[in-house]
Amino acid sequence: MNTVRVTFLLVFVLAVSLGQADKDENRMEMQEKAEQGKSYLDFAENLLLQKLEELEAKLLEEDSEESRNSRQKRCIGEGVPCDENDPRCCSGLVCLKPTLHGIWYKSYYCYKK
């Protein structure tokens, strides 16, 4: 009977010690997997951030193109017809009713001040 008890005790001690080792290994594996998961999340976060920055750059580029196209048209040079209500004559020019050569056109032209 003593041999059965000794054998049972030996098996019990081995099972407990090996079980503890497995438990420690499992804990280590879980920590490694958690660290890998964090690195994957960091990688995914960086990738998403990069995509968002590219999208933002494209949107800002489109906005700047719109503002470039919506700016005021170029100024009108000397001797060119202009609108009395919305003169776009270049600096140094004034939108005036013509004298002599343009009287019959009934339009305003850009002239020097």
Swiss-Prot record:
Keywords from the UniProt entry: Disulfide bond, Ion channel impairing toxin, Knottin, Secreted, Signal, Toxin
Domain observations: The presence of a 'disulfide through disulfide knot' structurally defines this protein as a knottin.
Protein name stated in the entry: U11-theraphotoxin-Hhn1a
Tissue expression notes: Expressed by the venom gland.
GO terms, molecular function: sodium channel inhibitor activity; toxin activity
Any Gene Ontology CC annotation: extracellular region
Role of this protein: Probable ion channel inhibitor.
Coiled-coil ranges (or none): none
Family to which this protein belongs: Belongs to the neurotoxin 14 (magi-1) family. 01 (HNTX-16) subfamily.
Residues cleaved off as propeptide: 22-74
UniProt cross-references to InterPro entries, sorted A to Z: Toxin_22
Name of a matching Pfam family: Toxin_22
Keyword field contains Disulfide bond: yes
Record's keyword annotation contains Secreted: yes
Signal peptide: 1-21
Main location: secreted
Cellular localisation: Secreted
